Amino acid sequence: MSSEDTLQVQQYGPWAVIAGGSEGVGAEFAALLAQAGLNLVLIARKPGPLQTTANRCREFGVEVRELTADLTSDKSIDEIISATADLEVGLFIYNAGANTHSAEFLDGDLADFQRVIDLNITTMMALTQHYGRAMRDRRRGGILLVGSMAGYLGSVRHTVYGGVKAYGRIFAEGLWLELRDHNVDVLELVLGVTRTPAMERVGLNFDVPGMRVADPAEVAREGLEHLAQGPVHVAGGNGVDVARRNDPDRARVVAGTHRMMQRLLGLD
């Protein structure tokens, strides 16, 4: 980041909390913030990648705390709040929003769908409220919530996931309105297809002709650069695709995007 960018990010210090900060876009957020001089609390489920990212960030001379937590569990909320109680958190990034249960709705398990809701809504809301209150009192800070283009229309096997992602965008827009007069920035960073370990594990076909595949480092940089602008930024040059997904002819746009998704997943 340039010195100008560093100064912009420094207003969100001295500590940043990144939920989902071990790999992919989350790890790139961590590296950029460490370069800018922010201390970090990195939260993830897998200790191995978490430690690797933490050590990478320590090379920039910042303090890094690692916290292994299952963000689908309500116990994680109290654990995270307790582990950061002594810190002045000026930036909260919620990057933990994967689809943990990909199944057609009538065939899926409700308990598994509930975990998708808890990961993407329940835990996100609780932590956002906790850190957001302190930021509002200090009259400075930033909240960055990572969203998905899946939240712009319905999709087979993403019925619940698409719904929670739509919720996240509307939530961010409302929170942005509530906090903008308190000098607290709010942004939902909307991701399209991004070459992350999580998307690779799902088995996405990145070689579909015409598919736009974003780089995690560039996506993270876009998010930090647009944080002060809020409330929503579509990453990876996908703005035109998102506009198309808002077409009022819902049958046409949903069916058309479904065909593209089938190719992306190698199911056509």
Stretches with model-predicted labels:
Residues 15, 22-24:
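Conserved glycine-rich cofactor-binding loop
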Residues 19, 89-97, 120, 145:
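Rossmann-fold scaffold of SDR-type NAD(P)-dependent oxidoreductases
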Residues 36-53:
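Conserved glycine-rich Rossmann-like NAD(P)H-binding loop of the short-chain dehydrogenase/reductase
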Residues 78, 82, 91, 97-114, ...:
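Conserved mid-core segment of classical short-chain dehydrogenase/reductases
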Residues 106-126, 140, 168:
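Catalytic Tyr-X3-Lys loop
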Residues 128, 164:
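Active-site helix of classical SDR
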Residues 148:
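Residue(s) in the substrate-gating loop at a strand-loop-helix junction
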Residues 188, 204-245:
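C-terminal helical subdomain
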